[in-house]
């Protein structure tokens, strides 16, 4: 429908005034001069990248990863950092829990010599550091471990047993308002790790909630619920964890999908194991009995030997990964693979 000529002139004058006052690009039509595709960073897990629908975690956004203790939250974020560093990106780790192990981080592929690390004294200090790094425009990925450890200054200066009702929630709410715009402008990915708490007296529905108030739930573009669902064994020895991640919230693609993968102790996410499984599922790798073949050539008897072959032949592994991503990311159904039930999906209130 054609717009009235006088209205067009008035709109052009208004747009000109806005750009003059606030700078070029402060207002534009949605389809012009901007990329429609969201830039992403791999999570280190092929199945999780596919479940997210965009091939990884989105740049310029806030992401929340939460789950029980020892479920793989920090491991997953370290894998994201390793993937970002391989692309030449600068990363920072805000270690509010004071528990980052540099030896373990190096084993997961993190370049610790070029990883910025801060162990702040208070929650306000941690969030100010995040804001300063985002505003610099020089840092691509920031990880905060964890929201539960972001202690307000008033609580640290007070005594144990003092009541500080809603302080952490108020601090997080103010930080979200300030950070969201700066992150978008600098195209910085900010990942918050969070812990789970139980609400008392919940008879029906999910009693679980996350710390730090409700603001983070609203501002996060992606929320991931990570759980340990079993053990990976070699004989009688436990060598890793079977892990399930649910995409509880997703603003860049269809939500409520899930991914399952292995986290091996001292190695991280079993990427090549996922590659074999997805390759077989998509008929890129042929499986006959115990033998695995690729392009007509046998690559190993048993999954372990197939994984070893892929590790020794990175070019073939890269080729299979590219084909899997093209098949599964470009042809995603509108219907999610997995829908969490109402109890899991509901946004619950925060206990202070």
Curated annotation (Swiss-Prot):
GO cellular component: cytosol
HAMAP family assigned to the protein according to its UniProt record, in alphabetical order: RecA
Annotated SMART domains: AAA
GO terms of biological process kind: DNA recombination; DNA repair; SOS response
Family: Belongs to the RecA family.
Organism: Klebsiella pneumoniae subsp. pneumoniae (strain ATCC 700721 / MGH 78578)
Chief localisation class: cytoplasm
Protein name, entry field: Protein RecA
Pfam families: RecA, RecA_C
Entry's localization field: Cytoplasm
Function (record text): Can catalyze the hydrolysis of ATP in the presence of single-stranded DNA, the ATP-dependent uptake of single-stranded DNA by duplex DNA, and the ATP-dependent hybridization of homologous single-stranded DNAs. It interacts with LexA causing its activation and leading to its autocatalytic cleavage.
KW Transmembrane helix (keyword) present: no
UniProt keyword list: ATP-binding, Cytoplasm, DNA damage, DNA recombination, DNA repair, DNA-binding, Nucleotide-binding, SOS response
A Gene Ontology molecular function term of the record: damaged DNA binding
First and last residue of the signal peptide: none
